[in-house]
């Protein structure tokens, strides 16, 4: 329960709590009102013990610190962070105008309207880049419009707390978000956050002007191929200036892709530009209450359980992946597989809607039943070994858990040592059938996947 005053809806003598706006695995979001200024806010209430237990504390601390650097009129603002023994409270700017792309769903925007939103988007992204902050996941859900018609970017700095909009997370995310991701992210060659954000801005501009995506196909691999080659056509109603700009931004080569600074220098971008937009690209001196010492916010404040879980969090911390990382890990979706040889027989991947602790517990049970010993368990990785040496030494198997969302995980299991045939037999006969209770879907089996045969050839 939230720590409220006696009248039942005043939080820490500062905010009146209103209706529930939404909720996720770790957080509930309420409409709130500052009782001194009467300003409407959004209050995200985080369960402290839950985030300690899954090892998200360090990441959240970093991201709160980031929020101090990105105070801009076109970015949803974090006003304040407060904490009690059991809860953490994020007081955020309340944006009630809805998503920008709800407007696009009603029909494409006129050039002047699209330009205004694009100017605000690019201005905010450039501001963040100047402070070493990169979004890397600009997409429709992250673009809101306030009651004055101004663009507001969400999840700059608080992405770890963003809830999946649908419970199955990955399934819908892979169908929606990849259309906005840069070719270099898909190809797993490493990428520059600045250039990735620039590409996404280009896709967003196209959608605002066209009313549809530049890269779309019912086959995900075909869509990735189009993205990799920047294979798209501008509709007839695009002006020549817009065509040139979009083509230079959606350059599949990040080295020659038009940088944001150059975008802002183009005649098309500067047309009708509000000079205040650029002038406001100066960090404000307005204080951010309670952010001076992030660690104070996350102190146990007398909660022994929180302290104990914090001490243990490094051992249980999972690698946090966004949808693109997951897609890249999946052989069926990985474009690098078109150019590089991979040995599918030595590893397997599946997604699960179970908690990390439940997955680990199941893996330990499977290891025991398969006569494997768990030698090491840290950072979301379980290292398992056989009891005796085979033809090529002791069989060693690693299982690593990656977090997609707090309630959705990817598990990768691969042979680390020993005989491949021995591993394949053990996997097919014992391990894979035993894991079926926690599997949402097997990854990378589109071409050779068959009904479960429990080891029959």
Curated annotation (Swiss-Prot):
Gene3D superfamilies: Kinase associated domain 1, KA1, Phosphorylase Kinase, domain 1, Transferase(Phosphotransferase) domain 1. Its cofactor is Mn(2+). Residues 345-374 are annotated as: PPI. The activation loop within the kinase domain is the target of phosphorylation/activation by upstream protein kinases. The PPI motif mediates the interaction with the ABI (abscisic acid-insensitive) phosphatases. This is CBL-interacting protein kinase 18. Keywords: ATP-binding, Kinase, Manganese, Nucleotide-binding, Serine/threonine-protein kinase, Transferase. It comes from the Eukaryota. GO terms for biological process: signal transduction. CDD domains: CIPK_C, STKc_SnRK3. Residues 155-184 are annotated as: Activation loop. Residues 15-269 form the Protein kinase domain. One of its GO terms (molecular function) is protein serine kinase activity. Its EC number is 2.7.11.1. CIPK serine-threonine protein kinases interact with CBL proteins. Binding of a CBL protein to the regulatory NAF domain of CIPK protein lead to the activation of the kinase in a calcium-dependent manner. It is an enzyme of class 2 (transferase). It catalyses: L-seryl-[protein] + ATP = O-phospho-L-seryl-[protein] + ADP + H(+); L-threonyl-[protein] + ATP = O-phospho-L-threonyl-[protein] + ADP + H(+). ATP binds at residues 21-29, 44. Residues 313-340 form the NAF domain. The active site is at residue 137. InterPro entries: Kinase-like_dom_sf, NAF/FISL_domain, NAF_dom, Prot_kinase_dom, Protein_kinase_ATP_BS, Ser/Thr_kinase_AS. It comes from Oryza sativa subsp. japonica.
